[in-house]
Each structure stands twice: as structure tokens, then as C-alpha cells.
Amino acid sequence: MIRLATQQDVLPIAQVHVQSWRESYKNIIKQEILDKLSVEQRTALWRSVLEQENRRVFVYEENAQVLGFAAFNFPVDAPISELRALYLLQNIKGRGIGRDLVQLGLGLSREKSYQHMQCSVLNLNSSRYFYEKTGAYFVSEGDASD
């Protein structure tokens, strides 16, 4: 089930965030960086994100357990919304959940009259092919600090 995240979800969102980074970015990001990821720091991050009026975070859960999430930004001063995060645990990928989360964000984006939605993906991240299947297209290249 997909639903809007609440403050009670910050810990499971942070746990999925850290685990998903470790699963997805192995061999893309240095292992020492992945080893330093902290659920506590991510919990603080997601608590802050959920307090922001222009952000929406949706979680995917099964049996009352959060297994994935997507975060969207709807800036008040720009015509483009953003997919800021989409993370699913490895064992649920390929079931259409990511697509459903993206479609939910695109629908909200249209409702709010945004012209486009953007997201950033590391070049070596194979999920860029997932985004292309959802209709995304390459705009520009930058480094991880962009």
C-alpha cells in the first residue's frame, strides 16, 4: 500500500534509505562512505523534510512495514517539480512499486500546474534506465556535488 508519510515514519524511512544506498550504490560509491551512513542522521533529515510545506513523501508498506519511499519537492518559485528521492529495498524491486510512486508524484505535479519534473541520477546508477522507461530523458551531466 502507498500512503502519505507521517512523522511516525521517519525511522523506517531512514532505515530504508541507508539500506537501499548500501544495496544500490555498492561499486558506485566508495565502501567507506557507505559504511559511514547513519540511520540517526537520516532520521533527522527525514524529520526535517516532513516538516516542510512544499515537500511530499510517500511510503510503500506491506504488513505495516515500510519497504520503500519517494520524496517530491514542489518549489513555490519554479515551474519544475522534483523527484528528490526514490528508494526501495532490493527484494521488492521489479514489482511496479517504483513506477507507481513516480506516477503519484507526476500526478501531484500536474495538479499543482508544474510543467515538468526533474530528478538527478548518478551516471553509473542502473536506475537511470528505470527513469527512462517512465518517460524521463537525459538533460545534462554533472558530478555528485551538483
Enumerate the language-model features and the residues they cover.
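Residues forming the Rossmann-fold NAD(P)(H) cofactor-binding site
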Residues: 99
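Short coil/turn segments at alpha/beta junctions that flank glycine-rich nucleotide-binding fingerprints
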Residues: 95, 112-115
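Active-site acidic-Proline motif in GNAT/NAT acetyltransferases
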Residues: 89-95, 123-124
